[in-house]
Amino acid sequence: MKIKNLSLSFFTVILLLFLIEISLRITGSGPRIIHDFALNEPITNIPDENLGWSPKIGQHIFKPWSDEGKITKLTINKDKSRVTGSDNLQKKKIIFIGGSVTQGWAVDDLETFTSFIQSKSKKYKISNFGVGGYGGFQSLLLLEKIFNNNKDIELVIYGYTPHHEVRNVAAGSWMYLLNFFSTRGFVRLPYASIDKKNNLVRNKPIKYINLPLGNKSALIAKLEKKIMKIKSLKREYKKFEISKEIIKEMNKISNENNSEFKFLILENLPKEKIDKYKDFLIKNNIALIYCPMPQGKEHVVKNEGHPSALGHKITSECIYKEIEILNTN
């Protein structure tokens, strides 16, 4: 009798799991997928023990993103910055840090807003240290590394987009996307948190959980997502506070190295969010540059989604006007 009951219970559980699996697939969920981007584009990143990943030195050639597009080059210098059109290392430096919008993903080397600014500046060397996928915390870690290897940096500009707040805390949703894009070199992610006194806490890189059969079962893939979501939930609630502490640390490190620091907003924000940042920046004596990328089809790369060369050009003009040292003799 006990064996019969156990068998019945076992088959009931199997049937229930099977029905859940079918239900998930019908409603659009599926097994874990990792897309092999190496089939269609060069791999531009390599693993980094502390940063998670870093740009791969050399020139990377991309096919057109659409029938209307063109071949583009993404060239990474020996110092891991992107080419901006000037090799004069004797000049004082203005450096930009941030994610893919700052880096200029999907446009050519000389079509990024940093390159457009460089073309107008003969006095300063403009260095673009933006890295695709980076948030504020990775940019902070990179900034520390930059200061260890560079002198004569007069100005540091952090190019912010709202999604950086999600990246800073290794939110479950972002970890899922990084896993999907992992063939681009995104494997592990360092993240930030804060303690009870709102002090910034630095956490070592982590990776997405890959359970057995997650690439075969929608149910197991869903369980992976839930686990990552639960693990990051408390940090996500504090993501704005964490973002502020990261920015404060960027400003502090810049000042300690005799550099000015500016906070650059590259995406339109709701008024409430802008006001919160303005209050924070004023309180901490940090300068704001508000130059969001323009919207509209002509301002994004077709079939890719990142800002186009025209979008970068327009934004570069806005940024140039806001950098006082570029507008003085």
Model-derived regions: residue spans:
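Conserved SGNH/GDSL esterase-like catalytic core that processes O-acyl groups on lipids
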Residues: 93-95, 103-181, 192
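Hydrophobic membrane-insertion alpha-helices, especially the h-region
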Residues: 8-23
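Membrane/wall-proximal cationic-aromatic binding patches
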Residues: 29-120, 294-299, 329
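Short, amphipathic alpha-helical "lid/cap" segments that border enzyme active or binding sites
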Residues: 136, 140, 240, 244, ...
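Histidine-centered active-site loop/cap adjacent to the catalytic His
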Residues: 6-8, 303-329
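Serine-dependent acyl-ester chemistry module
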Residues: 161-281, 286, 291-301
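Helix-to-loop transition at the C-terminal end of transmembrane segments
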Residues: 23-34, 168-169
